[in-house]
Amino acid sequence: VPGFSGKHYNSLDPKGRLIIPAPFREILSSNHSSKLIITNEVFDRCLCAYPVDEWQKLTDKVSRMPQTSDAVKYFTRRVIGSAVECEIDRQGRVLVSAALRTDAGLNSDVVLIGLCNRIEIWDRSEYDGVADPTKVDKDAYKEEFKSLGL
């Protein structure tokens, strides 16, 4: 099953609707459904959009974890607790809730990043800051990539 990949620049309309890029919609219609679960990313100030089946895998995994763990509680509250099921309309748009737009600091200009099983949705200026290759510890990353076999 092909996954999501690529970077797409887009904008939110005044009502908070976002056009899902055509390549992402094609993957969804071929392999998943016309719905996305949109939620907060656990640490970064962005949103994650999951196909329903991928979301189910994630929630099944979390439900098997120790619910007394502070990390699991945080993850559950931050990610699962803020999730909204969104239908992709005939124009290829989803309505991003006001609460999620606020949590992620989304203004009108956004970037959608395909990350295999999910899509990240960033405010353009926020993404430009975190994606700056001059701001990462390349040597440490090279070592970690090597240990991971990348």
Describe the predicted segments one by one.
Residues 2-42:
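A positional/architectural concept
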Residues 16-20, 92-96, 100, 119-121:
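Short, structured motif recognition centered on aromatic/hydrophobic residues
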Residues 30-45, 83, 105-122:
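A short beta-strand-loop micro-motif that forms or neighbors metal/cofactor-
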Residues 47-86:
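Helix-adjacent hinge/juxtasegments
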Residues 84-94, 98-107:
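Beta-rich strand-turn-strand
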Residues 113-139:
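C-terminal end-helix/capping segment
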Residues 134-150:
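Acidic/histidine-enriched, glycine/proline-rich intrinsically disordered or flexible terminal extensions
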